[in-house]
Amino acid sequence: MEVAAKLKYARISAQKARLVADQVRGLGAEQAVNLLRFSNKKAAALMKKVLDSAIANAEHNEGADIDELKVSTVMVDEGPSARRFHARARGRANQILKRTCHITVKVSDSQVEND
């Protein structure tokens, strides 16, 4: 059984969020939560909320045992970018991109399903 949780339009660049995603991919759920709790990165706090939601979904909707859950998939996709302008000298302007991303976390129990 695989259960997912998503956070869309997170106000962080996908490149920065992927650094944290690579750390938790494949870990046990409890170990991943502990790693994210003590990380100093902004993406870690966002990823922890999504992981907690996925764990709660697995427990409530599927009746899964929390101790057997592991992080099977973590995807960070680019979202739309908001454009802002930064005033420069001599009447010019530069563009600033406020990037967003979509974070998807899937947790699964260690059992393999047979169809």
UniProtKB/Swiss-Prot annotation:
Keywords: Ribonucleoprotein, Ribosomal protein, RNA-binding, rRNA-binding. It comes from the Bacteria. GO terms for biological process: translation. One of its GO terms (molecular function) is rRNA binding. Gene3D superfamilies: Ribosomal protein L22/L17 (3.90.470.10). One of its GO terms (cellular component) is cytosolic large ribosomal subunit. CDD domains: Ribosomal_L22. HAMAP family: Ribosomal_uL22_B. Belongs to the universal ribosomal protein uL22 family. This protein binds specifically to 23S rRNA; its binding is stimulated by other ribosomal proteins, e.g. L4, L17, and L20. It is important during the early stages of 50S assembly. It makes multiple contacts with different domains of the 23S rRNA in the assembled 50S subunit and ribosome. The globular domain of the protein is located near the polypeptide exit tunnel on the outside of the subunit, while an extended beta-hairpin is found that lines the wall of the exit tunnel in the center of the 70S ribosome. Part of the 50S ribosomal subunit. This is Large ribosomal subunit protein uL22. It comes from Coxiella burnetii (strain RSA 493 / Nine Mile phase I).
